[in-house]
């Protein structure tokens, strides 16, 4: 065995840690929701003339996910969407997540909506799911709690962080560091 092939075998056997994911959708949605999901860091919806398929992530989805659905890599976006939309979101997760070669998922649980939680992510992927607490969600929960905001924030964060592996904030990448926090 050559050194190059030994290295290739070693790399192929490595399991990955995905350090930033959200749970998968639990219910069907339309194509716009899917394409805007490919644009997650930008909170503005895609323009009507734009497509999430025309991004590096969109190209990767068609290259790697389409074959798992029995389609050729880089298939036309419409054909990909038609095949994908014929499969439930949880079933898609059970196909795509194990194929990613990830052993541990660090899940930002701060997105609202009908989204899989930690147990569902672990079950669908065959791996382990760990919570990343989004601080903005803690702030929203503290603002809705009775009593002193700072005390509520501390208590909620303490409880949520008890089993979490980390925290995160989306403030800087959504609005920059010059935002008015008053």
Predicted regions span which residues?
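Metal-cofactor-binding active-site regions of metalloenzymes
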Residues: 2-182
């Amino acid at each position: 065995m050559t050194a190059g092939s030994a290295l290739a075998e070693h790399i192929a056997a490595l399991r990955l840690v995905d350090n930033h994911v959200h749970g998968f959708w639990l219910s069907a949605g339309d194509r716009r929701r899917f394409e805007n999901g490919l644009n997650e860091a930008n909170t503005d919806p895609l323009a009507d003339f734009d497509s999430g398929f025309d991004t590096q992530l969109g190209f990767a989805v068609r290259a790697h996910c389409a074959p798992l659905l029995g389609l050729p890599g880089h298939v036309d976006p419409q054909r990909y969407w038609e095949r994908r939309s014929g499969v439930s979101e949880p079933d898609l997760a059970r196909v795509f997540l194990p194929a990613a070669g990830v052993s541990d998922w660090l899940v930002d649980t701060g997105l609202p909506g009908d989204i899989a939680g930690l147990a569902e992510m672990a079950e669908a992927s065959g791996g382990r799911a760990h919570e990343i607490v989004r601080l903005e969600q803690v702030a929203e929960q503290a603002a809705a709690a009775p009593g002193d905001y700072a005390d509520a924030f501390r208590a909620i964060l303490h409880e949520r962080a008890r089993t979490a592996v980390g925290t995160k904030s989306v403030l800087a990448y959504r609005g920059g560091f010059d935002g008015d926090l008053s």
